[in-house]
């Protein structure tokens, strides 16, 4: 029985972030490809064309560089910000440096940074 694209997309949309990461890794192994190389190849032409036009950055990425001495509070903050489950939030925190959120506004990035720093984490906004 063949599975339709819509069924595959529906299944993936119901997965957690960690499950999607594991799926991507399994696909990379099975098909001997790298998803990162494809993303760089697609993003490279856009970056060259948009560099002159993009004078002011409008989308930011929040990166946690370390969780400091209070890991429990940082995990709680990550769960509140991202909506991740306990295990996924713990894995994200322990995997520092790690991206917390991408493509957020300047105000939202500042708010996330403040919340994580109050919890004890070290955070960068890129």
Swiss-Prot record:
Keywords: Ribonucleoprotein, Ribosomal protein. The keyword Ribonucleoprotein applies. PANTHER family: 39S RIBOSOMAL PROTEIN L12 (PTHR45987), LARGE RIBOSOMAL SUBUNIT PROTEIN BL12M (PTHR45987:SF4). The lineage of its organism: Bacteria, Pseudomonadati, Pseudomonadota, Gammaproteobacteria, Legionellales. Homodimer. Part of the ribosomal stalk of the 50S ribosomal subunit. Forms a multimeric L10(L12)X complex, where L10 forms an elongated spine to which 2 to 4 L12 dimers bind in a sequential fashion. Binds GTP-bound translation factors. It comes from the Bacteria. This is Large ribosomal subunit protein bL12. Forms part of the ribosomal stalk which helps the ribosome interact with GTP-bound translation factors. Is thus essential for accurate translation. Signal peptide: none annotated. It comes from Legionella pneumophila subsp. pneumophila (strain Philadelphia 1 / ATCC 33152 / DSM 7513). GO terms for biological process: translation. GO terms for cellular component: cytosolic large ribosomal subunit. Belongs to the bacterial ribosomal protein bL12 family. One of its GO terms (molecular function) is mRNA binding.
């Amino acid at each position: 029985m063949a599975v339709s694209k819509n069924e595959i997309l529906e299944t993936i949309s119901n997965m957690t972030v960690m499950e999607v990461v594991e799926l991507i890794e399994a696909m990379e192994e099975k098909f001997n490809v790298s998803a990162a190389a494809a993303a760089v190849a697609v993003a490279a032409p856009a970056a060259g064309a948009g560099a002159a036009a993009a004078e002011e950055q409008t989308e930011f990425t929040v990166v946690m560089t370390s969780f400091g001495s209070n890991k429990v509070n940082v995990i709680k903050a990550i769960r509140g910000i991202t909506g991740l489950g306990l295990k996924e939030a713990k894995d994200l925190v322990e995997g520092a440096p790690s991206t917390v959120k991408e493509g957020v506004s300047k105000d939202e990035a500042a708010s996330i940074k403040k919340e994580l720093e109050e919890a004890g984490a070290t955070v960068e906004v890129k």
